[in-house]
Amino acid sequence: MGRWMAEHRPDIVWHCPQLPPSPAEAVAGLLDTVAGWGIDPAADLAVVGSSLGGFYATVLAARLGCRFVVINPAVEPARDLEKYIGEQTTWQDPSEHFYFKAAFIPELQALRPAVVSPVQRALAIIAQGDELLDWREMFARYEGAHIKLLEGSDHALSDFDEHLGDILGFLELTAA
């Protein structure tokens, strides 16, 4: 998506930072960044996230009222990540290590919005073939959102390019 944005919409700010392991710090940093832009998030911001990033996108949308797209979003990350306390590697670069602390579990619990809101401003792309997360939980959590339920695929959404058009369409993005 970053390549498409750079090539077709360089007029739009594309921000895809490496987030810190602390969920509270990650969300606070993202909120600070958005506040620094001086925009109306409900009108001028869209957030896209996958897996834990989908959880963060849901948190940001609940706080800012912006449009958002989630791809195989983590629904209960506090529960699901509890077994990963300790040293981990990043998905993007297995040579990069970080430490996931037990203290991050209550941070995730505190961040979880009670409901997905604004649900009508959400697109959820959910793969039934997700090998890490239960697609039925995702489907139930994002009830009322625009949902694209995929037969097969996987957690990483390896066929992402096939769905880019749906994401761009939902966000009303066309080539400039």
What are the functions of these language-model segments?
Residues M1-P41:
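Active-site catalytic motif of lipid deacylating hydrolases and related acyltransferases
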Residues R3, E7, V59-R63, A140-E143, ...:
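Short, well-ordered alpha-helices that flank and scaffold nucleotide-derived cofactor binding pockets
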Residues D11, A42-D44, G65, V119-R121:
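A general structural motif
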Residues Q18, S51, Q128:
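Nucleotide-sugar donor-binding loop of glycosyltransferases
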Residues P23-E25, F55-A57, P77-R79:
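Short active-site-adjacent helix-start/loop capping segments
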Residues D44-G49, V69:
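Short beta-strand immediately N-terminal to the catalytic nucleophile in serine-hydrolase-like folds
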Residues V48-A57, A61:
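Gly/Ala-rich beta-loop-alpha elbow adjacent to hydrolase catalytic centers
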Residues R67-A176:
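The alpha/beta-hydrolase serine catalytic core
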